[in-house]
C-alpha cells in the first residue's frame, strides 16, 4: 500500500524497514543482496548514495517519499499493490520513471495494480484494463472502457 503522504518514522532507516519487511515475508534474499538491490534501485531513482541510512520519510521531499515507495514495491514484489496518488509530489522526469516502473510491475505475471490518481498523463501512459469509479457513498461501478477515465478527467463527475 502506498499513501498520498507517507508518514515519517524517526529512528527507523529506509533500509531497516526493507530488511524487517523482507524478514517477515521470509524471503531467502541475503542481507548483502538486499542492500545491494536497495542501493541499485535508489540510484536508478536518483536518490543519494546514503539513502539506505536516512530515517524513513524524515525530512524527505514528497518526491523522495514516492521514490521510496517504488523501492518498496520493487523489493517486496507483492501480488497486489494499492497506490494512492503515486504521482503526487513528483516532477515530470520522476513521473516518467514512476510510470515505467509501474508498467513493468503491472506487466508481470499475476500482478494487480490499483491506482488512485487524478493525473491524466499517468492514466494515459499506464493504459489500465479497467476503471472503477466510486461515488460519495462509496458505491462503485467498474468500466472496461478506459474512455470513462478521460471523460471524468475532462468533464468531472456527473450525477
Give short role names for the model-derived ranges.
Residues 4-5, 11-25, 37:
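Q-loop/switch helix immediately C-terminal to the Walker
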Residues 130, 134-159:
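Conserved beta-strand-loop-alpha-helix hinge in the C-terminal portion
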Residues 73-74:
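ABC ATPase C-loop
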Residues 80-82:
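Walker B motif beta-strand of ABC-family P-loop ATPases
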Residues 95-108:
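Helical segment within the ABC ATPase nucleotide-binding domain
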Residues 85-86, 93:
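Walker B catalytic motif
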Residues 110-117, 119-126:
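Conserved H-loop
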Amino acid at each position: 500500500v502506498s499513501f498520498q503522504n507517507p508518514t515519517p518514522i524517526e529512528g527507523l532507516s529506509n533500509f531497516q524497514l526493507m530488511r524487517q519487511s523482507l524478514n517477515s515475508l521470509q524471503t531467502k534474499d541475503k542481507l548483502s543482496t538486499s542492500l545491494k538491490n536497495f542501493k541499485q534501485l535508489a540510484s536508478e531513482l536518483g536518490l543519494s548514495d546514503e539513502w539506505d541510512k536516512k530515517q524513513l520519510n524524515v525530512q524527505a521531499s514528497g518526491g523522495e517519499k514516492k521514490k521510496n515507495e517504488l523501492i518498496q514495491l520493487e523489493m517486496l514484489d507483492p501480488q497486489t499493490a494499492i497506490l494512492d496518488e503515486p504521482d503526487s509530489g513528483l516532477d515530470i522526469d520522476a513521473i516518467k520513471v514512476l510510470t515505467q516502473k509501474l508498467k513493468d510491475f503491472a506487466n508481470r505475471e499475476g500482478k494487480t495494480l490499483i491506482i488512485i490518481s487524478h493525473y491524466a498523463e499517468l492514466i494515459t501512459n499506464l493504459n489500465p484494463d479497467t476503471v472503477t469509479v466510486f461515488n460519495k457513498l462509496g458505491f462503485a461501478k467498474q468500466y472496461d472502457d478506459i474512455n470513462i477515465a478521460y471523460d471524468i478527467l475532462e468533464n468531472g463527475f456527473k450525477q
